[in-house]
Each structure stands twice: as structure tokens, then as C-alpha cells.
Amino acid sequence: MALCARAALLLGALQVLALPGAVAQETYAQGSPSGNHSVPLLTANVNVTENTTMQVVSNQTSQISTVKPSSVLPKNVTAATVRPATIKVSTPGVSPHVTPSASKSTPKTSASPNSTQTSASMTTTAHSSLLTSVTVSATTHPTKGKGSKFDAGSFVGGIVLTLGVLSILYIGCKMYYSRRGIRYRSIDEHDAII
């Protein structure tokens, strides 16, 4: 689960790092920072063991697209889906640092009891005085295991171990009582009361 959250945050961070440069190039090309710009998204290979759904919210374009990267995934994961929706870009803020924050919430009542929703929000500022805010939320659905299965080797091993310990205890008790036991002496004729 933590691996999926890290993968989602890493993919979101890669997109955040690519967005300011792309927005700055579009702004300088068209001359207006308030116009509608199309921002290309990064595609990356994701190696996770659970289903991950990421949503990137953006108000810059009204077009919603789905990117399914072709990647090497384990057999129990089908794909990672990235849906960009809105990105807020404003020019007044200038800051040379990145502020990441992550929060983890419990699943809603409509979700399955094993699903976990993780959301992260990251704000960064590029050198061109553009403020970019991207919100990434990931939902993981762990696959069900095969459950417990009878292991004959462990069963036989447990029986052998138990019998071995019992036999050692039995032999130890026999030796202890044989050394400590009552010593009988033979009755001689002169000691016998007749």
C-alpha cells in the first residue's frame, strides 16, 4: 500500500516538475498568461503491485484525456490511469521552493473495506514567476490472497518436534527418579525379626 502511495506521489511530482516549463513556453509563445494552454503530460513506466488511479485536477483546459502507459506490471495489476482535469496557473506568486503535503483518509462507506484513498497536494513555482498547483489522489484496491492453505510438511514437522520433546522429557524424568529413588537394602538374617 505504501508502495502505491509512493508511486502515485512520484508520478505526480514528475508531472509537477514538467508542467511549469511547458506552461512557461506556451505563455511566452502566445504572450498571454491567461489564455487557454494545452500542457503535455509525462508518461512513465509504473511498477506497482496494486491498482492505482490518479486524478490531476486542472482548470486550464476543458479537455479530459486518459493516459494508460504501457509498462511492465505484475500479473495482478492491469494498468495505472492518469486523468488530467484542471491546473491552476497564476502569475503573482514567486517562490523558489516546493511544498509537498500528503494526507491519508479512511475509505468511504461505499468503498470496499480493503481500499485506501490517498491524496497528495504539491505546489511549486518556476523561475518564470508562474505558480502551479497540482492535486493528486490515488485509490488502491489490494487483491485478495489465496487465504490459508494446509501445509502437510509443517503438520508432520510439528508432530515430530512434539514427540521429540516428549521423549526427551520422559528419558530425563526416568533418569532423575532412578538417581534419586529410595535405596532399599537387603535384610540380613541378624536384622530380621522373627
Curated annotation (Swiss-Prot):
Cytoplasmic side: 173-194
Localization in the cell: Membrane
Record topology, Extracellular segments: 25-151
Name of the gene this protein is made from: Tmem123
Lineage: Eukaryota, Metazoa, Chordata, Craniata, Vertebrata
Domain of life: Eukaryota
Gene Ontology cellular component terms for the protein in this record: cytoplasmic vesicle; external side of plasma membrane
Listed Low complexity bias regions: 99-124
Pfam families: MGC-24
Descriptive protein name: Porimin
Family affiliation: Belongs to the CD164 family.
Residue intervals passing through the bilayer: 152-172
PANTHER family: MUCIN/PORIMIN, PORIMIN
